[in-house]
Design a protein with these regions (language model features):
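An anion-engaging/catalytic patch
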Residues: 1-149
Length: 149
């Protein structure tokens, strides 16, 4: 949910075990386009790699209940595909997401260079999610044991 007036429909795919996001909703949230489907077609024409990516099985349709109460099919993307789409959108509304992607990418590369940073990030994430210090310590110990097995 982006705001009270703009929502991105999502669906959990039990088979793939991942979230899918409605492409038209994402485009509507990140652009001023009146026709998100047409905007998506234009982006695909401009970005051949994105078009090739979309032509595969990366954008399966999913059923959503519309405001009229009927079920409608909409093309969706998984998280990785969604992040690729955000990179292709030349809109000021997409810039905060692009900066966030750059920040997360830089942090991940730093964690690969210094694994201790990854452990520290895990600690902060577990605390942010509300886990107790005891639970966090047990979790980190179990991860350490799994690494040595």
């Amino acid at each position: 949910k982006i705001s009270e007036e703009m929502q991105i429909r999502t669906v959990w795919d039990e088979v793939q075990e991942k979230w899918y996001f409605c492409i038209n909703d994402v485009i509507a949230a990140l652009t001023d386009s009146k026709d998100p489907a047409e905007y998506f077609k234009k982006i695909r024409r401009r970005d051949s790699e994105l078009d090739d990516f979309v032509r595969g099985t990366n954008c399966p349709p999913h059923q959503f209940i519309a405001t009229d109460g009927k079920r409608h099919s909409a093309k969706c993307m998984d998280l990785q595909s969604l992040l690729r789409l955000v990179q292709a959108i030349p809109s000021k509304k997409a810039e905060p997401f692009k900066r966030w992607l750059a920040q997360v990418g830089a942090e991940r590369i730093q964690q690969m260079q210094d694994p201790e940073l990854g452990i520290q990030q895990s600690l902060m994430d577990y605390k942010r999610l509300g886990y107790s210090d005891n639970w966090i310590n047990q979790r980190l110990k179990s991860i350490e044991i799994c690494i040595y097995i």
